A protein has these predicted regions:
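Non-catalytic accessory regions flanking glycosidase/transglycosidase catalytic cores in CAZymes
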Residues: 2, 21-237, 242-250, 272-273, ...
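Hydrophobic h-region of N-terminal signal peptides that target proteins for export
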Residues: 11-22
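Bacterial N-terminal signal peptides that target proteins for export
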Residues: 1-10
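Active-site His/acidic residue clusters
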Residues: 254-268
């Protein structure tokens, strides 16, 4: 019965994706409904992830026994809302007390996840300092692979209890940090459904353990939010939600995509949309409500290359705008040197193409997602299970009621030609001056991309804009509402 139930859910979701974008002529009609607000966009969907993997931290963020401040400055340029650490697979073997206290006294440990020596010179206090420097929320993933609920609860004590409240709170003070860190977000392990993980287990066992971990951690600090391990298997998610559901606040999903063909790569955000919708349907079916939100806390291409990776990232953000009622956290994996937004190597420190996508959405997106209908030409993707009709033009729109600012994000996946869009704003009569920004490069493989201001545009109830090939366009204007 359970499998039949999920088969029906998948059929409905899959059918809705197939039918949303029928093949049409070259002109794309975009309809934005100012009165149909999907929901509030949680800024944590523009989040990041760093792990003790390759040169993400050591040789990237951390240089010798201090920060690489050029990397820190680039991170600041993203205005990051949230950052996940220490893993990833690394988290399943990490014992947090190895990474506190005087750096010279910390033990070197051999990391079984990535088969490398970790000097432990970057630990909890350094992570919190990084978050403070770049003004973002810390999100810590505890060790449920080889760790215990007691160890996790002690970590919450170290981070969140006031001086004098416990041994671990006083240990933080001893290490030079009088005030509690106030870490709000705590992950309950990482990918424990996979046999590549230390502590790999079945859904039932994980759910029982997650319930106990979350209870112990919340008894230390009831204000924290915990994120359980989810995946693209409805049966795993069902078990976790049924057993641990009352004790958790989020369930996670990790999605990576890889394909040599450009059009399949940039179609993959719609496969992610399908998976996220399926998880949202599972949450509703298992709990009868939407209290538990989704943390899409690892996503990326396995081989992010050039402008194509930026087109992919913009597609993900348009999906997250559409699913803002369900997805409240999302973290690209990873921030520095590993499938990165920032590269730090012998050539210096520099951003990759997707870096500018994050900047554009973070800087310009308003707090409310609007319903957008897109009617235009599409192509068929067959790489991600079944067939998905992929629109060449993909649009999301946001509204800031405090300033009456409308922002339209227009993604053109077509790598060959520009596409004309007729944009109609429903339930509005007026005229406004807007500003246009365009992210583009010479071709989809190019790493040399830039954001250009394309000048002014007059926004009317119906207006036209031609989206250049392989581009992301942002149109922003204050409407007289």
């Amino acid at each position: 019965m359970l499998r039949q139930f999920y088969a029906k859910i998948l059929l409905v979701i899959f059918s809705s994706i197939l039918l949303s974008f029928a093949e049409k002529g070259d002109e794309t009609k975009v309809r934005i409904d100012l009165t149909n607000i999907i929901g509030e966009i949680n800024p944590n969907i523009y989040g990041h992830f760093i792990e003790h993997l390759d040169k993400c931290i050591y040789g990237g963020i951390w240089k010798g026994n201090d920060f690489n401040y050029k990397v820190v400055d680039l991170i600041k340029g993203l205005n990051p809302p949230i950052m996940r650490w220490p893993g990833g697979n690394f988290a399943s073997g990490y014992h947090w007390m190895d990474g506190i206290g005087p750096i010279e006294n910390r033990p070197k440990k051999y990391d079984l996840a990535w088969h490398a020596t970790d000097p432990n010179t970057f630990g909890t206090d350094e992570f919190i300092k990084l978050c403070r420097m770049v003004n973002c929320e810390p999100y810590i993933c505890v060790n449920m692979g080889s760790g215990t609920a007691e160890e996790a609860a002690n970590w919450v004590e170290y981070c969140n209890l006031p001086a004098g409240a416990s041994y671990y709170a006083d240990l933080r003070v001893k290490n030079g940090h009088e005030q509690p860190y106030g870490v709000k977000y705590w992950g309950l392990g990482n990918e424990l459904y996979g046999d590549w993980q230390i502590g790999h287990t079945d859904a039932h066992t994980y759910a029982l353990n997650a319930r106990e971990f979350s209870k112990r951690m919340k008894w230390v600090d009831p204000s924290i939010k915990t994120i359980a391990v989810g995946c693209d298997d409805p049966q795993w998610n069902w078990e976790v939600l049924m057993i641990a559901g009352p004790h958790i606040d989020y369930i996670s999903l990790h999605e990576y995509y890889d394909h040599p063909d450009y059009y399949e790569r940039v179609a993959s955000p719609l496969a992610a949309e399908r998976s996220l919708k399926r998880l949202a349907a599972t949450i509703l079916a298992a709990t009868g409500e939407n209290r538990i939100k989704i943390a899409f806390d690892e996503w990326n291409l396995w081989r992010p290359q050039g402008l194509a990776s930026a087109i992919f990232s913009a597609g993900i953000f348009n999906v997250l705008h559409r699913l803002c009622q369900n997805v409240h956290i999302a973290c690209l994996a990873q921030l520095v040197n590993v499938l990165p937004l920032i590269i730090a190597d012998e050539k210096g420190e520099r951003p990759t193409p997707s870096y500018f996508v994050f900047q554009l959405y973070r800087q310009h997106a308003g707090p409310l997602a609007l319903k957008v209908d897109v009617d235009g030409e599409s192509y068929t993707s067959r790489a991600w299970g079944g067939e998905i009709q992929v629109p060449f033009i993909d649009v999301s729109a946001t509204l800031d009621k405090s300033s009456n600012k409308l922002t339209i994000f227009i993604l053109n996946r077509d790598k060959e030609k520009s596409r004309e869009c007729e944009i109609k704003i429903r339930d509005w009569q007026g005229k406004a001056e807007g500003q246009v920004w365009e992210l583009n490069g010479k071709d989809v493989e190019s790493d040399e991309v830039e954001v250009k201001e394309r000048g002014k545009i007059i926004i009317t109830p119906t207006f036209k804009y031609t989206a250049p090939a392989h581009s992301l366009t942002v149109i922003e204007g204050k409407l007289n509402l």
